[in-house]
Amino acid sequence: MSIILGIDPGSRITGYGVVQQKGSKCIYIASGCIRTKGDTLAPKLDMIFNGISEIIKQYQPTEFGIEQVFMAKNPDSALKLGQARGAAIVAATQADLYVCEYSARQIKQAVSGSGGATKEQVQQMVMQILNLSGRPQADAADGLAVAICHAHTAQTIVAMSGKVSKTVRGRFR
């Protein structure tokens, strides 16, 4: 049984989702957004770091997943996103959590079956997978999607580990 914290980083809004993995099922625990204020970046990064640290203390995750930076049209936006990710990653590593990173395409594929899924499709699938009665806010849904992606990816790696060790020159024994 694992508790997974998924993070969708952003310099203005960082979405998070906490799920418990029981076998092949994901059970909703919590989700929300860390909303930063102000015009300067340093206080925003501090809010992200402190917010993630507080979530870690409250929910005691055993695993941590975060979305990778994608190259936006605006390089300044990509740099700010990278710094927001850094603040979240430091909070995780200070809590002795191993950090796993996933591309937006991997996350969409794991949740919806399509790497090109829209935000609305991801939200809908998150609702179905976690059996939620209402639609989570977009950034929170993305955080939950990261956690679900991590759960599915980790499960696949564990399932394959026994088989991979039984191969010789690419063939199963």
Swiss-Prot record:
Q: Cross-referenced CDD domains, in alphabetical order?
A: RuvC (cd16962)
Q: What is this protein called?
A: Crossover junction endodeoxyribonuclease RuvC
Q: Which cofactor does it need?
A: Mg(2+)
Q: What's the encoding gene here?
A: ruvC
| Any GO BP | DNA repair
Its quaternary organisation is:
Homodimer which binds Holliday junction (HJ) DNA. The HJ becomes 2-fold symmetrical on binding to RuvC with unstacked arms; it has a different conformation from HJ DNA in complex with RuvA. In the full resolvosome a probable DNA-RuvA(4)-RuvB(12)-RuvC(2) complex forms which resolves the HJ.
Entry-linked InterPro entries:
RNaseH-like_sf (IPR012337), RNaseH_sf (IPR036397), X-over_junc_endoDNase_Mg_BS (IPR020563), X-over_junc_endoDNase_RuvC (IPR002176)
What's a GO cellular component annotated to this UniProt protein? Answer: Holliday junction resolvase complex
Which EC number applies? 3.1.21.10
| Taxonomic source organism | Psychromonas ingrahamii (strain DSM 17664 / CCUG 51855 / 37)
Q: Which Gene3D superfamilies match?
A: Ribonuclease H-like superfamily/Ribonuclease H
Q: Which HAMAP family match?
A: RuvC
Sorted alphabetically, the keyword list is: Cytoplasm, DNA damage, DNA recombination, DNA repair, DNA-binding, Endonuclease, Hydrolase, Magnesium, Metal-binding, Nuclease
According to UniProt, the reaction catalysed is: Endonucleolytic cleavage at a junction such as a reciprocal single-stranded crossover between two homologous DNA duplexes (Holliday junction)
Q: How is the cofactor bound?
A: Binds 2 Mg(2+) ion per subunit.
